[in-house]
Swiss-Prot record:
PANTHER family: GTPASE DER. GO terms for biological process: ribosome biogenesis. This is GTPase Der. The lineage of its organism: Bacteria, Pseudomonadati, Pseudomonadota, Gammaproteobacteria, Enterobacterales. GTPase that plays an essential role in the late steps of ribosome biogenesis. GO terms for molecular function: GTP binding; ribosome binding. CDD domains: EngA1, EngA2.
């Protein structure tokens, strides 16, 4: 399970500042869903290789009606979704009645809660936080989010130990044990070829999308066609069900974010679009099916969700549902809109289906397997270096400060998604346009479909950096004569 951390507190206590500080470690694309979650933002963050989802909530006023006000509904829902809460207060403003109301509500929820006193820059932290002990939430962690002061300590001494208790490292790195063998390449870490085979693992497939686009119908259609579901295996992600299934001799784990197998237990809150549930399913999947309603077209919510999928590095299959019943003219308009708004992800297969009637559903799994195989295929260093060399020959890197950027060699840096590491000189100065050129060149050369490909650049080390030049005996004698001449001239 990917842990969820919610930032709550009064308005203007620095929640958004801390949110930006936390998610910046992964340069995360914030999944902001307009309208549906007006005052909540979602982003991915990382601490020592352990990922978590961070929620930035709107301020809770704590008016005369208490904390349970309609203005705070979204923030209260974020508290329910979260595994841990960072309750933020303003050290400069001191203890306020709204802080007491929020603390009372948090105590009633019995959620792991840590009290964070922000804006302690320029203050004596010990004196600034004294009043907040009256909230009865235990130790107080002073920070200055705008400057980053105390944030690392907060992560290391609060979130990291809590995450260790929530999910031991061996559980978090469950898949890493498999992928570690994949990454050992020409560096003395040779492994037996048959020790690891990605084809032997079930493909984790998540079906995600906005409400009422047909996720449940598609899930039922897939399961109804196969009828080989052995049992429902409840997942660690809340309100999601992990359903083992088999198709064409290949094992899958269908991550159902619609709760289709427990429909009788679904509450009104679950029927709404649960952002957290969807984000956790994406994080846990190998391949994601993004379902879009053909009648409504691409919405901002679809693009936000798509951005999170790409930022997570997951393989992608786009499914345009409710294709039946549309006139040919409307179909052409929908395709033109898709080409225009989704032109930046030309690597993903697009399928036009009717989940209700089953047309086109059978072709989805061919693209799912293709995407998974592309993301897990092993490529040697010699092949990657050869592709890089051909790319440079076709289009040389630009000049930077009068010198040509030099690319030396490339090797694999990871899989799922495929990562290519390029070593060279001045590679940090490469413009984004050339980086995109290299990424597209590698994708076409490797025939990668359905999976994003990432390129990382590493600067070659200067062997003479931080080393003083050692003069030869002849140079030493010349230097002495020169120094004598300078002294006589004075």
């Amino acid at each position: 399970m990917v842990p969820v951390v919610a930032l709550v507190g009064r308005p203007n206590v620095g929640k958004s500042t801390l949110f930006n500080r936390l998610t910046r470690t992964r340069d995360a694309l914030v999944a902001d869903f307009p309208g549906l979650t007006r005052d909540r933002k979602y982003g991915r963050a990382e601490i020592e290789g352990r990922e978590f989802i961070c929620i930035d909530t709107g301020g809770i006023d704590g008016t005369e009606d208490g904390v349970e006000t309609r203005m705070a509904e979204q923030s209260l829902l974020a508290i329910e979704e979260a595994d841990v809460v960072l309750f933020m207060v303003d050290a400069r403003s001191g203890l306020m009645p709204a802080d007491e109301a929020i603390a009372k509500h948090l105590r009633s929820r019995e959620k792991p809660t840590f009290l964070v006193a922000n804006k302690t820059d320029g203050l004596d932290p010990d004196q600034a936080v004294v009043d907040f002990y009256a909230l009865g939430l235990g130790e107080i962690y002073p920070i200055a989010a705008s400057h980053g002061r105390g944030v690392l300590s907060l992560l290391e001494h609060v979130l990291l130990p809590w995450m260790e208790d929530l999910a031991p490292q061996e559980e978090v790195d469950e898949d890493a044990e498999y992928w570690a063998q994949f990454e050992a390449e020409e560096n003395g870490e040779e492994e037996e070829e048959d020790d690891f085979d990605p084809q032997s693992l079930p493909i984790k497939l998540a079906i995600v999308g906005r409400p009422n686009v047909g996720k449940s119908t598609l899930t039922n259609r897939i399961l109804g066609e196969e009828r080989v579901v052995v049992y429902d295996m409840p997942g660690t992600t809340r309100d999601s069900i992990y359903i083992p299934m088999e198709r064409d001799g290949r094992e899958y784990v269908l991550i159902d974010t619609a709760g289709v197998r427990k429909r009788g237990k679904i509450t009104d809150a679950v029927e709404k679009f649960s952002v957290i549930k969807t984000l956790q399913a994406i994080e846990d999947a190998n391949v994601v099916m993004l379902v879009i309603d053909a009648r409504e077209g691409i919405s901002d919510q679809d693009l936000s969700l798509l951005g999170f999928i790409l930022n997570s590095g997951r393989s992608l299959v786009i499914v345009v549902n409710k294709w039946d019943g549309l006139s040919q003219e409307v179909k052409e308009q929908v395709k033109e809109t898709l080409d225009f708004r989704l032109g930046f992800i030309d690597f993903a297969r697009v399928h036009f289906i009717s989940a209700l009637h089953g047309s086109g559903v059978g072709n989805l799994f061919e693209s799912v397997r293709e995407a998974y195989d592309s993301s897990t295929r092993r490529v040697g260093t010699s092949m990657l270096t050869r592709i890089m060399t051909m790319a440079v020959e076709d289009h040389q890197p630009p000049l930077v400060r009068g010198r040509r950027v030099k690319l030396k060699y490339a090797h694999a840096g990871g899989y799922n998604p495929p990562i290519v590491v390029i070593h060279g000189n001045q590679v940090k100065d490469l413009p984004d346009s050339y980086k995109r050129y290299l990424m597209n060149y590698f994708r076409k050369s490797l025939d990668v479909m359905g999976s994003p490909i990432r390129i990382q650049f590493k600067e070659g080390e200067n062997p003479y950096a931080n080393k003083r030049n050692t003069l030869t005996p002849t140079q030493m004698r010349k230097r002495k004569r020169l120094m004598k001449h300078i002294k006589k001239s004075k």
